[in-house]
Amino acid sequence: MHCVPLFCFLWFCHHLYYSQAVPIRKVQDDTKTLTKTIITRINDISHMYSISAKQRVTGLDFIPGLHPFQSLSDMDQTLAIYQQILSNLSSRNMVQISNDLENLRDLLHLLGSLKSCPFDEAGGLSALGNLEGVMEASLYSTEVVTLTRLQKSLYVMLQQLDLIHGC
């Protein structure tokens, strides 16, 4: 008689434990799919390849470089910086990629909330300040360097999404 409530409780706990794993996997898969979509969009922009990756462009130090991500929050902060830079570029392609980055950041936040991870505010945004002067002086170079670095960061992010099990 006492076993029935215990069995029901254990069944309920078992159901809760396994029901959470499915949404996390789905959100993670959606995150990877959107990341691949953004990479494909960047590949489709043909003018990106007209500047060598080895060529140095001065004055664009505000664009994040390639670095490993330690957490979902790191990914979000880097994407927030790229999103702000792209939103200042007027090309139609940049608007689409910026919107995709916003959706990707939303997925990262959802993934973080499912894993009970705290997210820091995107601190690098205030350091960007007013980009209009730099953008006017070298709009094309800014676009090319931003897309090149974003694409490399997305590849790293794609590889590390499976490796980040905690926050």
Swiss-Prot record:
List GO terms (cellular component aspect): extracellular space
| Keywords noted in UniProt | Disulfide bond, Obesity, Secreted, Signal
Task: Tell me where the signal peptide lies.
Answer: 1-21
Cited PANTHER family = LEPTIN
One of the entry's Gene Ontology molecular-function terms is:
hormone activity
Could you identify this protein by its name? Leptin
The subcellular location is: Secreted
- Keyword Signal found: yes
The family database entries (Pfam families) matched by this protein are listed as: Leptin
Q: What does this gene product do?
A: Key player in the regulation of energy balance and body weight control. Once released into the circulation, has central and peripheral effects by binding LEPR, found in many tissues, which results in the activation of several major signaling pathways. In the hypothalamus, acts as an appetite-regulating factor that induces a decrease in food intake and an increase in energy consumption by inducing anorexinogenic factors and suppressing orexigenic neuropeptides, also regulates bone mass and secretion of hypothalamo-pituitary-adrenal hormones.
This protein's superkingdom?
Eukaryota
Per the UniProt entry, the disulfide pairs are: C117-C167
GO biological process assignments? activation of protein kinase C activity; bone growth; cellular response to leptin stimulus; energy reserve metabolic process; intestinal absorption; leptin-mediated signaling pathway; lipid metabolic process; negative regulation of appetite by leptin-mediated signaling pathway
High-level lineage: Eukaryota, Metazoa, Chordata, Craniata, Vertebrata
Output the InterPro entries linked to this UniProt entry: 4_helix_cytokine-like_core (IPR009079), Leptin (IPR000065)
Q: Which family does it belong to?
A: Belongs to the leptin family.
The transmembrane segments are none
